[in-house]
Amino acid sequence: MPNMKKATASDNIVGMRIDMDIYRMNIDAIVSHLKRGFKRSDDFKIGIEIEHFVFDSNDRSAGYEKILDVMKDIMGEDDKPYYLEGHLIGFYNDRYSISLEPASQLEISIAPCASADELVCIYRDFRRILDPALSRYNLRVECYGYNPYESAQELDIIPKKRYEYMDRYFQKAGTRGRNMMRATASVQVSVDYSDENDAIRKYRLCLLY
């Protein structure tokens, strides 16, 4: 029978010190990463990613195959397709990239711009291409935080191994992981900062929204 040694107070203290050291290392790594992001104000850019739900006339999610047809329809000569495991899952050009989230949410990632006005112009140009194509397939996009029409379990995952693995993991871990993957859409904004105080000020301002 193995010799089982009871943990002592000294062992517990050592364990706590190791945990604190790891915690401190993580904090230092985060601070170092944020400091590397300091930029001069004349180099400031702003970036944005917008995720959309794509619905048909019955308020059902379009799904990968229909959105695939739309993507092929709107791709121009200068657009470069992005394939993964033989499946088209997006395309990109100098102004933006188009990709699909786990349950076929359509995402546009606009290249960093000097002003919000530039971002708006690029997004409007994209919608002028996208919306007519959607209409031809009796589809539309909506910008909700959560799918208001369907449960997460009803929504299929696109053919991407990483999402399949994530989906399996979330079936066993936590309670809302699959809901996050399949039934949510978001807007993500990236803002440059010059120093720690500038970063704090902008972060607090963003929290107001």
Enumerate the predicted regions with their spans.
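Short hydrophobic/aromatic beta-strand micro-patches
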Residues: 55, 190-192
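Short, conserved phosphate-binding/catalytic loop or strand-edge motifs used
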Residues: 181-187
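Inter-helical turn/loop segments and adjacent helix faces that build the functional surface
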Residues: 121, 192-202
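Histidine-acidic residue clusters that define the catalytic metal-binding segment
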Residues: 178
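Terminal catalytic/cofactor-binding subdomain
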Residues: 2-175, 183
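Conserved small/polar residues in nucleotide/adenosyl-binding loops
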Residues: 209
